[in-house]
Amino acid sequence: MSMADQLQIPADIKPRDGRFGCGPSKVRPEQLQALSTTAAPLFGTSHRQAPVKNLVGRLRSGLAELFSLPDGYQVILGNGGATAFWDAAAFGLIDKRSLHLSYGEFSSKFAAAVAKNPFVGDPVVIKSDAGSAPEPQSDPSVDLIAWAHNETSTGVAVPVRRPVDSGDALVAIDATSGAGGLPVDIGETDAYYFSPQKNFAGDGGLWLALMSPAALARVESIAASGRWVPDFLSLPIAVENSLKDQTYNTPAIGTLALMAEQVDWMLGNGGLDWAVKRTADSAGRLYSWAEERDYTTPFVADPKLRSQVVGTIDFVDDVDAAAVAKILRANGVVDTEPYRKLGRNQLRVGMFPAVDPDDVSALTQCVDWVVERL
């Protein structure tokens, strides 16, 4: 019998819900219940008819309220997830050249997608080591500046502020794991894009972008230039359909319904301010615990860059974090493993709004209990 099978964490210290994944993330039971009640009549019906379009409209209006969208900004959506949006943006938001901050797996991927696109110039890439981040900056040769609000692979969060002297360059923020859990002034961005499976406790396969009038104008001007774009990645097509409360091709009703329920739940509890305070509470508990123990330390050295939605905790060499995660998983406390390509002796903890801060505290108790017995 393995150590993971032998160690049984006492029930009275375990979290009430043991899901701490960084995406897919915890889905609240009330969201799942809605799939079989209020959303049930929508399954198997046309996405071009009022019932499904009303669901899309509910989601779009909810996001507009949650993020206090400035005048002229629009909620645009399409199928394919934020990964698809990287290619869509390369085709439809970059006129000639872009600048990218690269400080982890996901912030580097947008730059890589742009580098492969034959219609735009080679991107300017500003790199830093994992666990840190470059300062947002401008460059006179670029017309789009991009970085990630939250680097999911490392737990680094970079504030969203339009760089000085950025001129007419658009600011595109990958908010896949930041939107809904980190503070943001949408007016500082032109395309703030994300997916449902992080803070919004939904399934993947959908991208959403909060787009400014300048971004919408850029979409139109690039389309008018005659640049070839696959229809599936066409931002003009996405904009046209979104303004009609629909997607270009058939959406997953469950994904839309789960996310709409989560947005309504956030709004009902106090909106983005409430959600940000909740994730900050969770993060405060995790990082203070890690700093108090002699066998753990936060991976992100600069407290100002530590994410309050994705926490990465390093362990000393003589404590095997992988063994800890395996024992936790055997006891129903799941998805605390680090990002696979980072290759560190650490745990990674999702602290999205659906996660109860008390469960984060319980997780730390469980880790203490396990480490004492290794």
UniProtKB/Swiss-Prot annotation:
EC number annotated for this UniProt entry: 2.6.1.52
GO biological process, one term: pyridoxine biosynthetic process
Cofactor binding, per record: Binds 1 pyridoxal phosphate per subunit.
Binding site for L-glutamate: 48
Enzyme class (EC, first level): transferase
Binding site for pyridoxal 5'-phosphate: 82-83, 106, 152, 174, 197, 249-250
Biological or metabolic pathway of the protein: Amino-acid biosynthesis; L-serine biosynthesis; L-serine from 3-phospho-D-glycerate: step 2/3; Cofactor biosynthesis; pyridoxine 5'-phosphate biosynthesis; pyridoxine 5'-phosphate from D-erythrose 4-phosphate: step 3/5
Signal peptide coordinates: none
Reactions listed under catalytic activity: O-phospho-L-serine + 2-oxoglutarate = 3-phosphooxypyruvate + L-glutamate; 4-(phosphooxy)-L-threonine + 2-oxoglutarate = (R)-3-hydroxy-2-oxo-4-phosphooxybutanoate + L-glutamate
Cofactor(s) needed: pyridoxal 5'-phosphate
PTM annotation (N6-(pyridoxal phosphate)lysine): residues: 198
Pfam families: Aminotran_5
UniProt GO cellular component terms: cytoplasm
GO molecular function, one term: L-serine-pyruvate transaminase activity
Cell compartment(s), UniProt: Cytoplasm
This protein's UniProt keywords: Amino-acid biosynthesis, Aminotransferase, Cytoplasm, Pyridoxal phosphate, Pyridoxine biosynthesis, Serine biosynthesis, Transferase
Gene3D superfamilies xref list: Aspartate Aminotransferase, domain 1, Type I PLP-dependent aspartate aminotransferase-like (Major domain)
Role: Catalyzes the reversible conversion of 3-phosphohydroxypyruvate to phosphoserine and of 3-hydroxy-2-oxo-4-phosphonooxybutanoate to phosphohydroxythreonine.
UniProt cross-references to PANTHER family, sorted A to Z: ALANINE--GLYOXYLATE AMINOTRANSFERASE (PTHR21152:SF40), AMINOTRANSFERASE CLASS V (PTHR21152)
Entry similarity comment: Belongs to the class-V pyridoxal-phosphate-dependent aminotransferase family. SerC subfamily.
Assembly behavior: Homodimer.
Protein name (database record): Putative phosphoserine aminotransferase
Species classification: Bacteria, Bacillati, Actinomycetota, Actinomycetes, Mycobacteriales
Gene: serC
